[in-house]
Amino acid sequence: MDWAAPALTSFVADSSYRHLCCYGAGIAGNVFAFVLFISPLPTFKRIVRNGSTEQFSAMPYIYSLLNCLICMWYGLPFVSYGVVLVATVNSIGAVFQLAYTAVFIAFADAKQRLKVSALLAAVFVVFGLIVFVSLALLDHPTRQMFVGYLSVASLIFMFASPLSIINLVIRTKSVEYMPFYLSLSMFLMSASFFGYGVLLNDFFIYIPNGIGTILGIIQLVLYAYFRKGSSEEAKLPLLVTHT
């Protein structure tokens, strides 16, 4: 039927445009995530230069490693179809977090080295159990739900971690420990993957990244409000905490 041809052409065009927007959002999310992954480099340069981990904590990197591994697993075809950009960004993130943890272990004192090594081993044990359960005991739809809910919980917990920084900014009325470009990158990454998840209609992607987007906006608003009261620019990466 001749009337069907324009409708089909319009449908194909809309689908292609949606796919292009989805791919673009995913690529943008990967780029902004990479900025976040390299943000701790000045901290580890300092650790290597001083030959000591000082008062820095390895916990953000240990947790980020587990988060990246879970989300990477969710993005693989074994678990989900069509979300390969989730797998790529988190595989890169896992490599960075593992490298940071290895450097931390190399320069930590004996007590910290033992503790962090045990935590690192625990991360791989937990991830191994997740892989085993999802592959050996669950069919594909149930597997996607299982790993998806784990990734949502993991991402929400990770996005909630800056709440302590937000609280510090409000209490001190200073953005010294909330770097602007890091906050901006977190917002842009979350917003990009929120759009990616919406376009894919993937609940497990757009819900946690929607929360991350809101938290990113809050950080940027606080930065704009308290910036004039700060005597200097932020000093430490957002993901680094002190013990």
Swiss-Prot record:
Keyword flag Cell cycle: no
Key words, A-Z: Cell membrane, Membrane, Repeat, Sugar transport, Transmembrane, Transmembrane helix, Transport
Principal localisation: membrane
Cytoplasmic-side segments: 45-57, 111-117, 167-179, 224-243
GO MF entries: sugar transmembrane transporter activity
Topological relation to the membrane, as annotated: Multi-pass membrane protein
Listed transmembrane segments: 24-44, 58-80, 90-110, 118-138, 146-166, 180-200, 203-223
Localization annotation: Cell membrane
MtN3/slv domain location: 24-111, 147-230
GO cellular component: membrane; plasma membrane
GO biological process, alphabetically ordered: carbohydrate transport
Regions of this protein lying in the Extracellular compartment: 1-23, 81-89, 139-145, 201-202
Keyword Disulfide bond part of the UniProt annotation: no
Pfam families linked to this entry: MtN3_slv
Function: Mediates both low-affinity uptake and efflux of sugar across the plasma membrane.
Quaternary structure and interacting proteins, as annotated: Forms homooligomers and/or heterooligomers.
Database matches in PANTHER family: BIDIRECTIONAL SUGAR TRANSPORTER SWEET2A, RAG1-ACTIVATING PROTEIN 1
Family affiliation: Belongs to the SWEET sugar transporter family.
Name under which the protein is recorded: Bidirectional sugar transporter SWEET2a
Natural source organism: Sorghum bicolor (Sorghum)
Taxonomic lineage: Eukaryota, Viridiplantae, Streptophyta, Embryophyta, Tracheophyta
Gene that encodes the chain: SWEET2A
